[in-house]
Protein backbone atom coordinates (compact mmCIF):
# COMPACT_ATOMS: atom_id res chain seq x y z
CA UNK A 1 0.00 0.00 0.00
CA UNK A 2 1.46 3.34 -0.93
CA UNK A 3 0.72 6.44 1.05
CA UNK A 4 2.38 9.79 0.34
CA UNK A 5 5.34 10.33 2.64
CA UNK A 6 8.86 11.69 2.75
CA UNK A 7 10.03 9.57 5.68
CA UNK A 8 11.16 6.02 4.85
CA UNK A 9 11.96 5.02 8.43
CA UNK A 10 8.41 4.16 9.43
CA UNK A 11 6.56 1.37 7.65
CA UNK A 12 3.31 2.71 6.29
CA UNK A 13 0.18 0.76 5.75
CA UNK A 14 2.06 -2.26 4.62
CA UNK A 15 3.20 -3.59 1.26
CA UNK A 16 0.63 -2.02 -1.05
CA UNK A 17 -2.20 -3.96 0.49
CA UNK A 18 -4.60 -1.16 -0.32
CA UNK A 19 -7.74 -2.68 -1.72
CA UNK A 20 -9.66 -0.48 -4.12
CA UNK A 21 -13.49 -0.39 -3.99
CA UNK A 22 -15.11 -3.44 -5.55
CA UNK A 23 -18.59 -4.27 -6.77
CA UNK A 24 -19.50 -7.93 -7.00
CA UNK A 25 -21.59 -9.97 -9.42
CA UNK A 26 -23.20 -12.37 -6.97
CA UNK A 27 -24.83 -15.79 -7.15
CA UNK A 28 -27.96 -15.96 -5.00
CA UNK A 29 -26.98 -12.62 -3.51
CA UNK A 30 -23.89 -13.96 -1.75
CA UNK A 31 -20.13 -13.90 -2.26
CA UNK A 32 -17.68 -15.62 0.09
CA UNK A 33 -13.95 -15.37 0.68
CA UNK A 34 -12.91 -18.28 2.88
CA UNK A 35 -9.82 -18.98 5.00
CA UNK A 36 -8.21 -15.57 4.54
CA UNK A 37 -5.28 -14.93 6.89
CA UNK A 38 -5.29 -11.38 8.28
CA UNK A 39 -1.60 -10.52 8.47
CA UNK A 40 -2.00 -6.92 9.68
CA UNK A 41 -4.79 -4.97 11.36
CA UNK A 42 -7.42 -4.20 8.74
CA UNK A 43 -9.82 -1.28 8.40
CA UNK A 44 -12.76 -2.26 6.23
CA UNK A 45 -15.44 0.20 5.04
CA UNK A 46 -18.70 -1.26 3.79
CA UNK A 47 -20.36 1.19 1.41
CA UNK A 48 -23.24 -0.95 0.11
CA UNK A 49 -24.63 -4.36 0.99
CA UNK A 50 -24.11 -6.38 4.16
CA UNK A 51 -21.14 -8.31 5.53
CA UNK A 52 -20.64 -11.21 7.92
CA UNK A 53 -17.17 -11.92 9.29
CA UNK A 54 -16.36 -15.13 11.16
CA UNK A 55 -13.01 -16.33 12.50
CA UNK A 56 -11.54 -19.66 13.55
CA UNK A 57 -12.45 -18.95 17.18
CA UNK A 58 -16.16 -18.93 16.35
CA UNK A 59 -16.53 -15.18 16.85
CA UNK A 60 -18.65 -13.48 14.21
CA UNK A 61 -20.16 -10.11 13.40
CA UNK A 62 -22.75 -9.14 10.81
CA UNK A 63 -23.62 -5.59 9.76
CA UNK A 64 -25.14 -3.67 6.87
CA UNK A 65 -23.73 -0.56 5.21
CA UNK A 66 -22.73 2.12 5.99
CA UNK A 67 -20.20 1.09 8.62
CA UNK A 68 -16.52 0.62 9.40
CA UNK A 69 -14.87 -2.57 10.68
CA UNK A 70 -11.55 -3.01 12.46
CA UNK A 71 -10.07 -6.52 12.27
CA UNK A 72 -7.24 -7.82 14.43
CA UNK A 73 -4.09 -9.22 12.87
CA UNK A 74 -3.08 -12.88 13.04
CA UNK A 75 -6.46 -14.52 12.58
CA UNK A 76 -8.10 -16.51 9.79
CA UNK A 77 -11.50 -15.29 8.66
CA UNK A 78 -14.34 -16.01 6.28
CA UNK A 79 -16.08 -13.03 4.69
CA UNK A 80 -19.67 -13.55 3.56
CA UNK A 81 -20.96 -10.60 1.55
CA UNK A 82 -24.60 -10.04 0.60
CA UNK A 83 -26.04 -7.57 -1.84
CA UNK A 84 -28.78 -5.15 -0.84
CA UNK A 85 -30.94 -3.86 -3.70
CA UNK A 86 -28.46 -5.37 -6.14
CA UNK A 87 -25.33 -3.75 -4.70
CA UNK A 88 -22.32 -4.54 -2.57
CA UNK A 89 -19.34 -2.22 -2.40
CA UNK A 90 -16.42 -2.08 0.03
CA UNK A 91 -12.91 -0.70 0.51
CA UNK A 92 -10.11 -1.70 2.88
CA UNK A 93 -6.85 -0.41 4.32
CA UNK A 94 -4.22 -2.62 5.95
CA UNK A 95 -2.40 -0.99 8.88
CA UNK A 96 1.14 -2.14 9.62
CA UNK A 97 2.48 -3.38 12.95
CA UNK A 98 4.85 -0.40 13.17
CA UNK A 99 2.05 2.08 12.66
CA UNK A 100 -0.16 0.37 15.26
CA UNK A 101 2.71 0.69 17.74
CA UNK A 102 2.74 4.45 17.20
CA UNK A 103 -1.01 4.73 17.57
CA UNK A 104 -0.89 2.63 20.74
CA UNK A 105 1.55 5.04 22.39
CA UNK A 106 -0.75 7.97 21.64
CA UNK A 107 -3.94 6.27 22.79
CA UNK A 108 -2.29 4.77 25.87
CA UNK A 109 -0.94 8.14 27.00
CA UNK A 110 -4.43 9.68 26.79
CA UNK A 111 -6.34 6.69 28.16
CA UNK A 112 -8.99 6.86 30.80
CA UNK A 113 -8.02 4.38 33.51
CA UNK A 114 -11.57 3.09 34.01
CA UNK A 115 -12.03 2.62 30.27
CA UNK A 116 -8.84 0.59 30.09
CA UNK A 117 -9.75 -1.57 33.10
CA UNK A 118 -13.19 -2.27 31.60
CA UNK A 119 -11.53 -3.21 28.31
CA UNK A 120 -9.10 -5.64 29.92
CA UNK A 121 -11.93 -7.37 31.81
CA UNK A 122 -13.92 -7.86 28.62
CA UNK A 123 -13.80 -11.12 26.66
CA UNK A 124 -11.24 -10.68 23.85
CA UNK A 125 -12.75 -9.34 20.64
CA UNK A 126 -11.03 -9.86 17.31
CA UNK A 127 -13.09 -7.44 15.28
CA UNK A 128 -15.24 -4.39 15.90
CA UNK A 129 -17.65 -2.28 13.93
CA UNK A 130 -18.55 1.40 14.18
CA UNK A 131 -21.26 3.43 12.53
CA UNK A 132 -19.86 6.07 10.21
CA UNK A 133 -20.05 9.39 12.01
CA UNK A 134 -19.95 12.65 10.04
CA UNK A 135 -16.59 12.97 8.34
CA UNK A 136 -15.46 9.36 8.81
CA UNK A 137 -16.43 8.15 5.34
CA UNK A 138 -14.78 11.16 3.68
CA UNK A 139 -11.67 10.68 5.83
CA UNK A 140 -11.38 7.01 4.82
CA UNK A 141 -11.88 7.87 1.15
CA UNK A 142 -9.34 10.68 1.28
CA UNK A 143 -6.70 8.18 2.41
CA UNK A 144 -7.84 5.68 -0.20
CA UNK A 145 -7.84 8.15 -3.08
CA UNK A 146 -4.65 9.86 -1.95
CA UNK A 147 -2.73 6.74 -2.81
CA UNK A 148 -0.84 6.64 -6.08
CA UNK A 149 -0.64 2.90 -6.57
CA UNK A 150 1.11 1.27 -9.54
CA UNK A 151 0.13 -2.24 -10.57
CA UNK A 152 2.83 -3.79 -8.41
CA UNK A 153 3.88 -1.48 -5.59
CA UNK A 154 6.91 -1.27 -3.37
CA UNK A 155 7.08 -0.52 0.34
CA UNK A 156 6.52 3.15 1.05
CA UNK A 157 6.39 4.75 4.45
CA UNK A 158 4.16 7.19 6.22
CA UNK A 159 5.50 10.15 8.16
CA UNK A 160 4.34 10.87 11.72
CA UNK A 161 3.21 14.29 10.53
CA UNK A 162 1.61 13.10 7.32
CA UNK A 163 -2.08 13.91 6.88
CA UNK A 164 -2.81 10.21 6.38
CA UNK A 165 -1.23 9.37 9.74
CA UNK A 166 -3.64 11.60 11.64
CA UNK A 167 -6.56 10.56 9.46
CA UNK A 168 -5.96 6.89 10.27
CA UNK A 169 -5.57 7.70 13.96
CA UNK A 170 -8.93 9.46 13.85
CA UNK A 171 -10.61 6.41 12.29
CA UNK A 172 -9.06 3.96 14.75
CA UNK A 173 -10.04 6.18 17.69
CA UNK A 174 -13.67 5.22 16.99
CA UNK A 175 -12.87 1.73 18.30
CA UNK A 176 -10.43 2.38 21.14
CA UNK A 177 -12.92 3.05 23.92
CA UNK A 178 -15.32 0.32 22.94
CA UNK A 179 -15.36 -2.64 25.37
CA UNK A 180 -12.24 -4.64 24.53
CA UNK A 181 -10.66 -1.76 22.59
CA UNK A 182 -7.54 -1.28 24.71
CA UNK A 183 -7.05 -5.02 24.91
CA UNK A 184 -7.20 -5.10 21.10
CA UNK A 185 -4.47 -2.43 20.93
CA UNK A 186 -2.25 -4.23 23.41
CA UNK A 187 -2.45 -7.43 21.35
CA UNK A 188 -1.82 -5.46 18.16
CA UNK A 189 1.64 -4.38 19.35
CA UNK A 190 2.75 -7.90 20.21
CA UNK A 191 4.34 -9.97 17.48
CA UNK A 192 4.55 -13.75 17.39
CA UNK A 193 7.20 -15.98 15.85
CA UNK A 194 4.57 -16.95 13.29
CA UNK A 195 4.19 -13.31 12.23
CA UNK A 196 7.97 -12.82 12.06
CA UNK A 197 8.28 -15.85 9.78
CA UNK A 198 5.35 -14.65 7.65
CA UNK A 199 6.91 -11.19 7.22
CA UNK A 200 10.23 -12.67 6.10
CA UNK A 201 8.61 -15.01 3.57
CA UNK A 202 6.24 -12.44 2.07
CA UNK A 203 9.10 -9.96 1.66
CA UNK A 204 10.27 -12.05 -1.33
CA UNK A 205 7.93 -14.81 -2.46
CA UNK A 206 9.93 -15.51 -5.59
CA UNK A 207 12.66 -16.91 -3.34
CA UNK A 208 12.49 -20.55 -2.26
CA UNK A 209 12.69 -20.08 1.49
CA UNK A 210 13.93 -22.92 3.69
CA UNK A 211 13.46 -23.17 7.43
CA UNK A 212 17.21 -22.81 7.86
CA UNK A 213 17.26 -19.52 5.93
CA UNK A 214 14.34 -18.09 7.90
CA UNK A 215 15.83 -19.27 11.19
CA UNK A 216 19.06 -17.51 10.25
CA UNK A 217 17.16 -14.28 9.60
CA UNK A 218 15.69 -14.59 13.09
CA UNK A 219 19.09 -15.41 14.64
CA UNK A 220 17.98 -18.78 15.96
CA UNK A 221 18.57 -22.44 15.17
CA UNK A 222 16.18 -24.50 13.09
CA UNK A 223 15.29 -26.56 16.15
CA UNK A 224 14.48 -23.40 18.13
CA UNK A 225 12.31 -22.12 15.29
CA UNK A 226 10.43 -25.42 15.08
CA UNK A 227 9.93 -25.43 18.84
CA UNK A 228 8.58 -21.86 18.91
CA UNK A 229 6.19 -22.53 16.02
CA UNK A 230 5.00 -25.76 17.65
CA UNK A 231 4.25 -23.77 20.82
CA UNK A 232 2.11 -21.46 18.67
CA UNK A 233 0.43 -24.49 17.08
CA UNK A 234 1.44 -23.64 13.53
CA UNK A 235 3.83 -25.15 11.00
CA UNK A 236 6.36 -23.52 8.71
CA UNK A 237 4.57 -24.92 5.66
CA UNK A 238 1.22 -23.44 6.81
CA UNK A 239 2.78 -19.99 7.21
CA UNK A 240 4.41 -20.31 3.79
CA UNK A 241 1.06 -21.24 2.23
CA UNK A 242 -0.77 -18.34 3.93
CA UNK A 243 1.83 -15.87 2.64
CA UNK A 244 1.55 -17.17 -0.92
CA UNK A 245 -2.25 -17.27 -0.92
CA UNK A 246 -2.57 -13.79 0.60
CA UNK A 247 -0.28 -12.38 -2.03
CA UNK A 248 -2.19 -14.21 -4.75
CA UNK A 249 -5.49 -12.71 -3.55
CA UNK A 250 -4.03 -9.22 -3.56
CA UNK A 251 -2.37 -9.51 -6.96
CA UNK A 252 -5.47 -11.00 -8.59
CA UNK A 253 -7.68 -8.36 -7.08
CA UNK A 254 -5.35 -5.58 -8.24
CA UNK A 255 -5.25 -7.08 -11.73
CA UNK A 256 -1.46 -7.14 -11.44
CA UNK A 257 -1.09 -9.85 -14.08
CA UNK A 258 -2.62 -12.95 -15.62
CA UNK A 259 -2.81 -16.21 -13.70
CA UNK A 260 0.55 -17.45 -14.97
CA UNK A 261 2.25 -14.20 -13.95
CA UNK A 262 0.62 -14.23 -10.52
CA UNK A 263 1.70 -17.85 -10.02
CA UNK A 264 5.30 -16.84 -10.72
CA UNK A 265 5.11 -13.79 -8.43
CA UNK A 266 3.86 -16.05 -5.65
CA UNK A 267 6.75 -18.48 -6.08
CA UNK A 268 5.03 -21.27 -8.03
CA UNK A 269 6.84 -22.90 -10.94
CA UNK A 270 3.73 -24.02 -12.82
CA UNK A 271 0.34 -22.28 -13.19
CA UNK A 272 -1.54 -25.59 -12.96
CA UNK A 273 -0.13 -26.34 -9.52
CA UNK A 274 -0.87 -22.79 -8.37
CA UNK A 275 -4.48 -23.09 -9.59
CA UNK A 276 -4.95 -26.39 -7.75
CA UNK A 277 -3.54 -24.99 -4.48
CA UNK A 278 -5.57 -21.78 -4.76
CA UNK A 279 -8.81 -23.69 -5.37
CA UNK A 280 -8.13 -26.06 -2.48
CA UNK A 281 -7.40 -23.14 -0.14
CA UNK A 282 -10.15 -20.65 -1.05
CA UNK A 283 -12.76 -23.03 -2.56
CA UNK A 284 -12.75 -20.97 -5.76
CA UNK A 285 -10.52 -20.96 -8.85
CA UNK A 286 -8.24 -17.98 -9.55
CA UNK A 287 -10.15 -17.27 -12.77
CA UNK A 288 -13.52 -17.19 -11.01
CA UNK A 289 -12.04 -14.98 -8.31
CA UNK A 290 -10.65 -12.56 -10.90
CA UNK A 291 -13.98 -12.36 -12.72
CA UNK A 292 -15.78 -11.66 -9.46
CA UNK A 293 -13.39 -9.07 -8.09
CA UNK A 294 -12.56 -7.26 -11.30
CA UNK A 295 -16.04 -7.19 -12.80
UniProtKB/Swiss-Prot annotation:
Positive regulator of the expression of the invasion-associated type III secretion system encoded within SPI-1 (pathogenicity island 1). PROSITE patterns: HTH_ARAC_FAMILY_1, HTH_ARAC_FAMILY_2. The keyword 4Fe-4S does not apply. PANTHER family: HTH-TYPE TRANSCRIPTIONAL REGULATOR GADX. Gene3D superfamilies: Homeodomain-like (1.10.10.60). InterPro entries: Homeodomain-like_sf, HTH_AraC, HTH_AraC-typ_CS, Tscrpt_reg_AraC-type_HTH. GO terms for cellular component: cytosol. GO terms for molecular function: DNA-binding transcription factor activity; transcription cis-regulatory region binding. Residues 195-292 form the HTH araC/xylS-type domain. The gene is sirC. Residues 212-233, 259-282 bind DNA. It comes from the Bacteria. Keywords: Activator, DNA-binding, Transcription, Transcription regulation. This is Transcriptional regulator SirC.
